[in-house]
A protein has these predicted regions:
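Acidic, surface-exposed loops and disordered segments
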Residues: 1-150
Length: 150
């Protein structure tokens, strides 16, 4: 696992790890609100690699109020398990940068919330509380383009 200074971690998974992640998503798709996880599992199986980007939770000490509390100390005291707004903001920036690099190299990819949930359930990003998955494909046609509707 690569730890980016601050709160972010990344992993690149291939082979059996892709199979495990897809299997976990299929299992999780039994819950009605997560039926789309089964479709996303198929996309993961069509990829050569999955990039995982995760964030640990911790306050940045900026007292910005974006979390709904006036100070970081109040947020930590009253909602210690809630993310600092900057934790998820930084996660989004990192994922945007990763898919941009993939596009620059003409690799097809898609950002999957479901893959991040599955990766967290499998503890693929130890210590992280939020994650997104980016399946990557280098085939003739993008498997992420003509996704079947639910």
């Amino acid at each position: 696992m690569t730890e980016i200074p601050g709160w972010l971690s990344t992993e690149i998974r291939t082979g059996d790890a892709i199979e495990r992640l897809a299997s976990k998503l299929k299992e999780m798709s039994a819950e009605p609100s997560r039926a789309f996880f089964a479709r996303d599992a198929e996309n993961i199986l069509q990829s050569g690699a999955v990039v995982l980007v995760g964030s640990r939770y911790g306050v940045m000490g900026l007292n910005c109020g974006w979390c709904g509390f006036p100070t970081c100390a109040e947020k930590t005291g009253q909602a210690p398990l809630a993310p600092c707004a900057f934790n998820t903001n930084d996660l989004g920036i990192a994922v945007g940068s990763a898919v941009s690099v993939a596009a620059d190299h003409r690799a097809d990819c898609r950002v999957l919330y479901s893959g991040g949930v599955g990766a967290l359930a499998l503890d693929m990003l130890p210590g992280c509380r939020a994650a997104l998955a980016i399946p990557v494909s280098a085939t003739g046609k993008s498997p992420f383009f003509d996704r079947k509707p639910l």
